Design a protein with these regions (language model features):
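Family-specific signature for flavin-dependent thymidylate synthase
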Residues: 1-225
Length: 225
């Protein structure tokens, strides 16, 4: 898994804003032009907007992230319909990036949750070894069949049916407003999200915090209150 910021709205010099945080406050003050360039109080205004659910100013800036993951996780990500996506096409290009996954146990109380193995437990270590061996065997067979199909002239869009989605790597670009990113990160960092997806959301939130520190602090403070 890897996440990187590849694009971010940048305020023009005419706004007098130095940061994206300040630009959100600038847009929020559209009805108060005499105070629109008051960057000093921008953090306080952002905190107020978040606390009281005034989200429209956060739609004035957008971010695009590059996400490298597996296709089963990307299927979960693209369900967030307020975003725009571009994803690696298995119809157009040959898949040659694969990943062996870790073993986790099913949570019997929550079907959407898994439980980490205890590697001090001999039984759990054997479970992990069997799972790793099974994946290696499946992947070797699938890759051999996939490559043979391509050599026989089978179209990529058909040959991809031979590949296990949970081990097939993909890259996608995910673009959305800051409002959408806040909602996505809140939802997907919470309990009930698959661990691999939650790790992506955590990384996205960390990146957002680097560029919107006042926003991140206000959201985190609200969630922890």
């Amino acid at each position: 898994m890897n996440v990187a910021l590849v694009a971010l709205s940048k305020p023009s010099a005419s706004t007098g804003c130095n940061t994206a945080d300040e630009f959100i406050a600038y847009c929020a003050r559209v009805s108060n032009p005499d105070n629109q360039n008051n960057n000093k109080t921008a953090p306080g205004l952002l905190k107020y907007l978040i606390k009281h659910g005034h989200w429209s100013p956060f739609e004035m800036v957008s971010l695009t992230m590059e996400i490298q993951t597996t296709r089963d996780i990307s299927h979960q990500i693209v369900r967030h319909r307020s975003f725009s996506f571009q994803e690696f096409s298995q119809r157009y290009a040959v898949t040659n990036v694969f990943q062996i996954r870790e073993a986790r146990l099913q949570d019997e109380k929550n079907r959407q949750n898994s439980i980490a193995l205890d590697y001090h437990n001999n039984c759990h270590r054997r479970i992990n070894e069997r799972f790793q061996m099974a994946q290696t065997k499946v992947l070797r067979t699938a890759r051999d069949a996939y490559e043979s199909a391509l050599e026989d002239g089978i179209a990529k869009e058909q040959a991809r049916a031979l590949l296990p989605e949970g081990m097939s790597g993909t890259t996608l670009y995910m673009a959305g407003t800051l409002r959408s990113w806040i909602h996505y990160c809140d939802l997907r960092r919470a309990n009930g999200t698959q661990q691999e997806h939650a790790e992506i959301a955590e990384r996205c939130w960390s990146i957002i915090g680097d560029h919107f520190p006042s926003v991140r602090k206000a959201v985190d403070d609200l969630n922890n209150s």
